[in-house]
């Protein structure tokens, strides 16, 4: 049995449906990070042959497999120059001839929709109630569709200009349009003021979870609160159990998510490994028994 199988579009969709966390965005990641594969039907991998970066998600789809063995097998097969790994547990800082250049710990925050009081009554929601009402008084409106416009690209460009982005962030941003074009499930939640786009979220849906992988906003007051409140209402109306807001990322973003009653459901360690010029080699790959192509869709 092949250890790594190439994933077709239909297989990606199935991974998204059966996943619990990072697997939800397999289709999106496959457009941003490279050709998608699955290791023993459990761990997802994406290989970008241009940058020679291998992305591994060690969150489990089916059962459990040895994570270190997955990494060793992947490095032998793909021969990457760099590894980017997300995992629910800590990893060694040196692996198969790769040394860790960067590590981060984070938590994924989600709102439990059935227990959320959408009326925003009471002292707990006083600030949120004010911000939502402030946005409504200013005339913000929401439109849900799948259409990217020059306004979307302009807001993304402004976001990129104001930040020093990692390569994988830029790759995700560039993949939004194609994700909407190739897959049926994602939607755009667009906020407007007097007919002009002022911000938007990319939203997707899997089983009982509604997830927001990316959001882009101008500096319009109370904008993020307005959009999130509308998304909570949408999740309520469509009987979703969880609204996934993503990683905490920073103390300010984490505080925002906590105010909206989001709780950490998954612990994440993110590692960036670079190939070492000396030390233990990674060996040679006998790919005939490691990699299997699933053919065209």
Language-model segments: which ranges?
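Active-site/acyl-donor-binding loops of N-acyltransferases
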Residues: 2-10, 98-120, 238-297
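Short catalytic/ligand-binding loop motif for oxyanion handling, primarily in non-cytosolic enzymes
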Residues: 54, 91-95, 152, 252-254
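A short, internal acetyl-CoA/4′-phosphopantetheine-binding micro-motif in the GNAT/acyltransferase core
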Residues: 57-66, 114, 214-222
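Hydrophobic beta-strand residues in large extracellular and virion-surface proteins
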Residues: 44-45, 56, 83-85, 109, ...
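Acyl-donor-binding surface of acyltransferase catalytic domains
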Residues: 64-141
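A conserved beta-strand-loop-helix scaffold within acyl/acetyltransferase catalytic domains
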Residues: 2-51, 96-103, 120-221
């Amino acid at each position: 049995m092949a250890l790594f199988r190439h994933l077709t579009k239909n297989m990606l969709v199935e991974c998204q449906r059966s996943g619990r966390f990072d697997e939800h965005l397999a289709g999106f990641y496959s457009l941003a990070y490279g050709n998608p594969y699955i290791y023993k039907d459990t761990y997802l991998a994406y290989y970008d042959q241009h940058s020679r970066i291998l992305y591994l998600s060690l969150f489990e789809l089916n059962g459990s497999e040895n994570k270190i063995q997955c990494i060793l097998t992947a490095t032998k097969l793909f021969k990457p120059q760099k590894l980017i790994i997300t995992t629910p547990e800590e990893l060694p800082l040196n692996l198969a001839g790769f040394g860790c250049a960067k590590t981060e710990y984070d938590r994924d925050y989600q709102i439990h929709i059935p227990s959320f009081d959408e009326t925003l009554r009471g002292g707990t929601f006083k600030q949120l109630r004010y911000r939502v009402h402030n946005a409504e008084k200013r005339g913000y409106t929401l439109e849900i569709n799948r259409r990217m416009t020059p306004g979307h690209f302009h807001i993304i460009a402004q976001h990129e200009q104001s930040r020093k982005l990692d390569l994988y962030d830029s790759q995700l941003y560039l993949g939004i349009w194609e994700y909407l074009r190739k897959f049926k499930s994602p939607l755009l939640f667009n906020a407007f003021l007097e007919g002009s786009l002022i911000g938007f979220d990319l939203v997707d849906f899997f089983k009982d979870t509604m997830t927001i992988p990316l959001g882009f906003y101008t500096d319009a007051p109370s904008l993020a609160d307005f959009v999130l409140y509308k998304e909570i209402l949408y999740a309520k109306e469509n009987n979703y159990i969880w609204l996934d807001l993503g990683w905490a990322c920073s103390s300010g973003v984490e505080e925002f998510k906590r105010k909206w009653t989001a709780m950490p459901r998954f612990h994440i360690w993110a590692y960036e490994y670079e190939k070492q010029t000396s030390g233990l080699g990674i060996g040679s790959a006998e790919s005939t028994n490691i990699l299997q192509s699933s053919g065209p869709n």
